[in-house]
Amino acid sequence: MSMDNLVRIIEKDQIKDVPEFRPGDTVKVYVRFKEGNKERTQAFEGIVISMRGSGISKTFTVRRIGANGIGVERIFPLYAPIIEKIEVVRRGKVRRAKLYYLREVRGKVKIKERR
């Protein structure tokens, strides 16, 4: 058995079921974290602006406009144990794989809805 096959077998065990989403979609990511001795879940809702990597190491970047109009971006590993669940709020229709141009856009961003 080659090392590549061994890595694939181990990755298959780690992969959990997540909904299908693409850049342009608005998602709500529920993140679990420890605060002292208790665990809390916090939701982070925003537009997926990029997805990169493959397999177990796949990551996605979510951007939202926070308080005072300041943009906040978070990069999440797709199969991380800290992610409780991912909800697709809205499906967006875009023609790019990376939506980094949204960083310069001020105000509300218009993304057409995919059916």
Swiss-Prot record:
Pfam families reported for this sequence: Ribosomal_L19
Gene Ontology cellular component list: cytosolic large ribosomal subunit
Entries under InterPro entries matching the protein: Ribosomal_bL19 (IPR001857), Ribosomal_bL19_CS (IPR018257), Ribosomal_bL19_sf (IPR038657), Translation_prot_SH3-like_sf (IPR008991)
Recorded GO MF terms: structural constituent of ribosome
Any one Gene Ontology BP term: translation
Keyword DNA repair among record annotations: no
Function text: This protein is located at the 30S-50S ribosomal subunit interface and may play a role in the structure and function of the aminoacyl-tRNA binding site.
Name of the molecule in the record: Large ribosomal subunit protein bL19
The organism of origin for this protein: Thermosipho africanus (strain TCF52B)
